[in-house]
From Swiss-Prot:
It is an enzyme of class 2 (transferase). It comes from the Bacteria. Coiled coil: none annotated. Pfam families: Ppnp (PF06865). Keywords: Glycosyltransferase, Transferase. GO terms for cellular component: cytosol. Catalyzes the phosphorolysis of diverse nucleosides, yielding D-ribose 1-phosphate and the respective free bases. Can use uridine, adenosine, guanosine, cytidine, thymidine, inosine and xanthosine as substrates. Also catalyzes the reverse reactions. Its EC number is 2.4.2.1, 2.4.2.2. This is Pyrimidine/purine nucleoside phosphorylase. SUPFAM superfamilies: RmlC-like cupins. Gene3D superfamilies: Jelly Rolls.
């Protein structure tokens, strides 16, 4: 396992690998963030609420707990975290 912190500690993730492949589990505190991808990602919102502006979309869309979204490799996307949010991200 590897622990990573981003944005002055406001985003923390733990990277791991299991039978489903590589993944990170993490928490994002309230704030606005921009992320870049190096490979395809499936982001699942476990708890909390955020809004994301994905590549090619005209604006932000709400993603509450239980929802998910996909991002292709080599893309940037923006996130507005409305309340502290836990996520699980799978890479492929």
């Amino acid at each position: 396992m590897q622990v990573n912190e981003y944005f002055d500690g406001n985003v923390t993730s733990i990277a791991f690998e299991n039978g489903e492949g590589r993944a990170t589990s993490g928490v994002m505190l309230v704030g606005d963030y921009e992320f870049g991808t190096s490979e395809k990602e499936l982001m699942k919102i476990v708890s909390g609420k955020l809004e994301a502006k994905l590549p090619g979309e005209p604006g932000f869309r709400a993603y509450p707990a239980g929802s998910e979204f996909r991002i292709d490799a080599n893309q940037k996307f923006q996130v507005r975290v409305i309340e502290p949010t836990a996520y699980l991200c799978f890479y492929s």
